[in-house]
Swiss-Prot record:
Name of the molecule in the record: Thioredoxin Asp f 28
This protein's UniProt keywords: Allergen, Disulfide bond, Redox-active center
UniProt site positions, description: Contributes to redox potential value: G34, P35
Matching SUPFAM superfamilies: Thioredoxin-like
Organism: Aspergillus fumigatus
């Protein structure tokens, strides 16, 4: 279901490696989630626009341990990382405008 330069992650170890440095956007989604499917092409466009930011996608049903560890309660949920640390604020739902504003804050 990934679009653009979004990396699908299905392993907790790879997740840890990909979020350990730099600016990262993590899209927690589920294949059965309508809003997730609707927003995926827009996230793909953002991944092309912000090429200095790593975009990864985590299927909460396949990588339950990461979803649990990150306390994901709704999909889609976007968690942004800067220098290996998750930002406290998250984007829950398909608000692409809010997501892009947060991406700008980590990509500078």
């Amino acid at each position: 279901m990934s679009h653009g330069k979004v990396i699908a992650v299905d392993n907790p170890i790879i997740y840890k490696a990909l979020t350990s440095s730099g600016p990262v956007v993590v899209d927690f989604f589920a294949t059965w989630c309508g809003p997730c499917r609707a927003v995926a092409p827009k996230v793909g466009e953002l991944s092309e626009k912000y090429s200095n930011v790593r975009f990864i996608q985590v299927d909460v049903d396949k990588v339950r341990s990461v979803a649990h560890e990150m306390n994901i309660r709704a999909m889609p949920t976007f968690v942004l990382y800067k220098d290996g640390q998750p930002l406290e604020k998250r984007v829950v739902g398909g608000n692409v405008r809010e997501l892009e504003e947060m991406i700008k804050s980590i990509s500078a």
